[in-house]
Amino acid sequence: MTNIRKSHPLIKIINHSFIDLPAPSNISSWWNFGSLLGICLILQIITGLFLAMHYTSDTTTAFSSVTHICRDVNYGWIIRYLHANGASMFFICLFIHVGRGLYYGSYTFLETWNIGIILLFTVMATAFMGYVLPWGQMSFWGATVITNLLSAIPYIGTNLVEWIWGGFSVDKATLTRFFAFHFILPFIILALVIVHLLFLHETGSNNPSGISSDMDKIPFHPYYTIKDILGFLMLISMLLILVLFSPDLLGDPDNYTPANPLSTPPHIKPEWYFLFAYAILRSIPNKLGGVLALILSILILAIIPMLHTSKQRSMTFRPLSQCMFWLLVADLLTLTWIGGQPVEHPFIIIGQLASILYFSLILVCLPIMGMIENNFLKW
């Protein structure tokens, strides 16, 4: 009798995706982050579902409903902080996952890469809407500033913003629709993740060497399931340390003040994981130019496969490209720091230089390094 996991129509799909999947024998811990993102997504959906049971999406009660969750609901405080800090963990894993794709040339799997970019945009949209829901000062003003960026679109901009707001300012209609979208988007993300995996399993995983590993595969279970469990344990440990010891470390104190349309906070800034894009937006004095730079800072990932000039896929054996990659990482950290600083003398110029460097490294330096390294191969 055939094993049920190989014959049952449903279990067979799971078997081919997570158990008998042929995986390269040499993939490192950088390949753990895909499964960690899956765990983060499931955690966010579960905690979010429980929060939605007690949350009310009305401007008069939203803030107090979040307070009620933390004070009166059994274990409400831990569910709320797991959800808030779980988002931070999600983005840490997401950035590392994208970085690993860049470093090892995984972007040559075009369908997988493009679905990944759509996923990145969707997750960012979901996180932004989630930040608006507690209806604190930063929620309200963050929503006002970011949605207002659409008014930079010529001709239809103002109408578009008012259509999204459902009125002439961020108000009850905006909060209600943001809650509806914030609830539905994770399930759309889940569907996209399945498509992402479907395309990945068409080609098989990449590996650190960047060369085909068809002749040297091992089953996913038990080798990589055990390896992934170690990643899960480390992720959950870090998340619990954050939640139980300093749950507000990554949040903004202004969000503990109820939203007040008549009082603007001194520094409006998004959550830490959007600061790099926010810094790029602020570094351009023109509104439309800033919005375009903001969108391109993420969308630039889509043209990276076209900018690949090297004869080698991975950066493992390409020291010049490695230098450019780590310079890019340092530049993104600089942008993240600048995004959280006030708009005044030293920070403005640092932000502008870091923004120029960001686009230069991707569009100019990495392709040139690839060509130089191709010449090294002739020696």
From Swiss-Prot:
Heme b b566 binds at H97, H196. GO terms for biological process: mitochondrial electron transport, ubiquinol to cytochrome c. Its cofactor is heme b. Keywords: Electron transport, Heme, Iron, Membrane, Metal-binding, Mitochondrion, Mitochondrion inner membrane, Respiratory chain, Transmembrane, Transmembrane helix, Transport, Ubiquinone. The cytochrome bc1 complex contains 11 subunits: 3 respiratory subunits (MT-CYB, CYC1 and UQCRFS1), 2 core proteins (UQCRC1 and UQCRC2) and 6 low-molecular weight proteins (UQCRH/QCR6, UQCRB/QCR7, UQCRQ/QCR8, UQCR10/QCR9, UQCR11/QCR10 and a cleavage product of UQCRFS1). This cytochrome bc1 complex then forms a dimer. Belongs to the cytochrome b family. Heme 1 (or BL or b562) is low-potential and absorbs at about 562 nm, and heme 2 (or BH or b566) is high-potential and absorbs at about 566 nm. This is Cytochrome b.
